[in-house]
Amino acid sequence: MTQTLDTREDPLNLGGGGGGGCGCGWAHSASLSSWSSCHRRRPGAPAYNRPHRYSPKTEYGPPRKQPKQQHGPGFWFQPPVCSNWGCWGGPWRPPPPGFWKFPCPVQVFRVYGLHPLCFCCCSCWSGSWNPGWVKPPGRKKRWGRRGRGLRHHPRHSYPRSPPADVSTLPRPVKLYEWREPGMRAPPNTTQFIMNQIYEDMRQQEKVERQQEALRAQKATVSGEASPARSSGNDAPPGGSKETWGLQETLYGFVQNPSLAFSPNPEENQSLAPLLVEEEEEKKNDDEEEYDQEVCDAKEASEEEEEVEDEEEEVEDEEEEEVEEAEYVEEGEEELEEEELEEEEEVLEENEQRGEEFHLPLEMPLSIFVEAEEKRENFISCTFLNPEQIIPKVPQESLFMAQDFNC
């Protein structure tokens, strides 16, 4: 007869696991314990090394004693079915509209735990009966538990971009001034480049003209010096004049190679004034062209001004005509208004006179009708005589009043 030593399964030690008071003294081969949903340790297994089939952290420790509360798809809090609170239980709700009093302008502001329909200042600010308005319980932060979720919870949903380099950004545009190295070219870049090229060509032409003028001056000076030499040395030393001239030319070529293809001094003398005259003619032509352009521009501007003056005069005349027409229309309207006002005044005066002038009852009303017909023939009835319109009835019968007191 074997008795179990587990007092939890057999607290009275009656022999036999969970036998209770049945009187069975023999122990069962497997302990008959009540079934439970929570995990229980087998009797022979160690505390920290039990075989958990589906647990990812088998080596760290035992599983949770109670299953973790999982928030399902529905509401995470259901109010109690029945309670002792009666009508004072549940969330705060405003009183019926008959009890509302607003001593001051209502201020609506949000406080944690405040029911969205509560506008008063009372004890319900500390918290509401319905925990549905409170945030569901979150996970408590612990040290060294980063591996549960994201390693670094990002403050921004996008990665921060590095600050932009200001030196690489485009600079503003200068159209009509000297461009700095960092400045952008103007939008019409091709025109700008062509203008620069033409300006360079003009500068080059000017420099070439100056060089030609200097060469002409040098040629004239050398031409003046050569006849003085020939007059001083009448008898050339050895040889004829031709050989002496050849030697001079060769010596001149060796000394100044730029004169190798230069014309004779006489030609130079004749060419120098020609060049000067050509330059003067060119200058005069340029000045004349410039003066002509200026005159043309002035004439064009004067013509434009004349055309504008004529247009302005035409516009002024049209405006004056329109103003005159408007003035005439306004005068006609004023005359019509004055006539209407006079007619209204006459009618009002007639009405007032009629009200003030009390006619006797015996006086017939045909007088006014005849007067109106004479003044303005309102009624033009050819098929009705005035006797038919206003029949002659004895006046006594008109103003007869029956005696009702009889």
From Swiss-Prot:
Biased composition of type Basic residues is found at: 138-158
Residues passing through the membrane, by range: none
Where it sits in the cell: the answer is: Nucleus
Record's compositionally biased regions (Basic and acidic residues): 203-212
Question: Which InterPro entries does the record associate with it?
Answer: CCER1, Coiled-coil_domain
Which Gene Ontology biological process is one annotated for this entry? Answer: sperm DNA condensation
Region (Disordered) spans which residues?
43-72, 138-167, 203-244, 278-358
Q: Which residues form a coiled coil?
A: 199-225, 274-359
Keywords, in A-Z order: Coiled coil, Differentiation, Nucleus, Spermatogenesis
Q: What does this protein do?
A: Regulator of histone epigenetic modifications and chromatin compaction into the sperm head, required for histone-to-protamine (HTP) transition. HTP is a key event in which somatic histones are first replaced by testis-specific histone variants, then transition proteins (TNPs) are incorporated into the spermatid nucleus, and finally protamines (PRMs) replace the TNPs to promote chromatin condensation.
Q: What is this protein called?
A: Coiled-coil domain-containing glutamate-rich protein 1
Q: Which organism is it from?
A: Homo sapiens
